Amino acid sequence: MAIIEKLEWDSSFFGINIGRSILRDEKEFDTRLFNKEIKANRFDLVYVIKFQNLLPWAKMLDLNLQLMDIQITMSMDFTSNSHKGLIYNLKNNLTVEEINDSYKIAEDTAVVSRFYKENKIGNQKTRDLYRKWIDNALNKSFSDGVFIEKVSGKVAGVHLIKTDNIKKIGMFTLTGVDGNFKRMGIGRKLWLQSFGFWANESDIETIKSPFSFQNSESLNFHLKMGFNKIEEIKYIYHSKN
């Protein structure tokens, strides 16, 4: 049984052969098979995902891994009645100027991504990926839509969400604020829009938000906004051929 799964979308978008391996128990992980599959399938890059705990240093060396990110998913219980009065406007259409502003914010947000630090992917491809997330929110192929906040006619922040009505979970997929409008409460306004949307347009009971642990401001902001539970800690490594 293969231990590396080929990621078709990532491979196509980034133009290199990319795989992923979920490493649940390093003691039972077959290092020789892992390295054999990399060579046999000519993977240029493999994401290795480890949950809860870091890999031992010796295992990192055996697998030729580099730790690229520590991703935390926090959650909060959601009560619709507390947010029904909030004003919201989930958009699937933006003006050309709004789209360009949103692209710029998304591209600026890309600098914190692990892909941005990965030389096999590069800065421009990472910026293209974050622009794609805006497109995929507007066409509803991944996210539900885009919330924006404007200051003096200019988009100052964007916020993308995804709703799972079956599991009754709302997910944050991207939040970005223009650097010129930091510390003006834009992020809070964006998140409150999504609270209002979910309170009136869904039956969700939980909101989950993944973010990079490297972003200490984001951690503090989550706590401030009521996220009080850590759902998951994910250590993301890259193995390069």
Features from the language model and the residues they span:
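Conserved active-site alpha-helix within GNAT-family acetyltransferase domains
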Residues: 53-67, 188, 213-231
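Active-site rim helix/loop that mediates acceptor-substrate recognition in acyltransferases
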Residues: 54-59, 123-146
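Conserved GNAT acetyl-CoA-binding A-motif
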Residues: 41-52, 199-211
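Conserved acetyl-CoA-binding loop-helix of GNAT-fold acetyltransferases
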Residues: 28-37, 174-179, 183-198, 220-224
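Acyl-donor-binding surface of acyltransferase catalytic domains
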Residues: 23-97, 233-237
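Conserved acetyl-CoA binding element of GNAT-fold acetyltransferases
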Residues: 11-26, 72, 168-179, 210
